[in-house]
Amino acid sequence: GRVHNILDEKPEYAKRLKVTSPILMKEKYDILYSFGDEKSPRYDEYYKNRVFSTTFKSNLKASLEKLASYVIKAVDKDGVSVVILDDRTLSENEKAIPAALAVGYVNQKLLKEGLRHSVSIVAITGEVYDPHMAAVLIGFGCTAIYPYMMFASTVAFFQREKPSKYEMQKLLKNTQKSVNAGILKIMSKMGICTVASYRNSGLFDIIGLSDEIVNDCFTGAHSDLAGLTYSDIEAKINKSHHNAFVEENSMFPLDLGGFYKYSNGGEYHDYGPATTNAMHNKKAAKKEDITDFEG
């Protein structure tokens, strides 16, 4: 909900919804949504929410601008205090805007319009599957996250064991608990002990994104090496989207993307020793040439 001046006390300033974790399970998300849903008996206009799709057909940058303009209008004119960014409208014709770009771009536009204190941002995304991904969204302005794909993966993985309803609920809570622990570990390395203090801190080093994207979405974050532009990212999205929908009902090997630990003699990883050493050497030489990071 809205954040007011802490030096000016009024009863209505206490009207805030509190969650015990930034990672929402479905039940908690449904409760949160019900407070701002005009069709719900729980509805209170102070918690008015609106869902915005974060999918697009073409032109990533223009789609981000359009999304931000809709959000700003809803907050400024319609009194929306909870903005929900949802990528579940993904389909064969609709591609998903990367969650970090959507959250970061909307967050920065709200800041520039002087409206950020009036709204909380909730992300419904399939991209968050580990503590780092969650920390990125929180660090760039997200208040809470409903990682539906992560919980769906937990259900699918353990379904073969035919757990009871109680056991499945416990497994889902353990999944949430593990991500919470990871977020706490990330925050503690920066000497931060509360999510409220970590939110919108931008305490990340950015490698491989153009200055335009950093300025638009991740203002204030430290960027070592420039790289991908909006058009480059859109090309990657198009490729992934094509691979996902190229043939209906077909199953393909899971592409892990090279984010996990390098093992000598094991599978190739994007972030292996050769790549990281090249980045370190390039930074030490104070030279930047995008061609060194292509391919």
Model-inferred region functions:
Residues E127-G141:
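Catalytic cores of alpha/beta
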Residues D87, V106, L137, T194:
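Conserved, mostly hydrophobic/aromatic
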Residues K95-I121, N174-A181, K185:
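Alpha-helix-loop-beta-strand connector modules within alpha/beta enzyme cores
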Residues S58, S69-V82, R88, Q108-L115:
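Conserved helix-loop functional segments at active or binding sites
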Residues R88-L90, G126, C142, M149-A152:
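Short, ordered loop/turn segments at secondary-structure junctions
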Residues R50-A68, S120-D130:
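Active-site mouth loops of central-metabolism enzymes
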Residues E92-Y105, S153-E161:
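Active-site-adjacent beta->alpha loops and helix N-cap segments on the catalytic face
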Residues G1-K61, K73-V75, V80-V82, M133-A134, ...:
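Flexible, glycine-rich loop/tail regions that form catalytic "lids" or insertion modules at the edges
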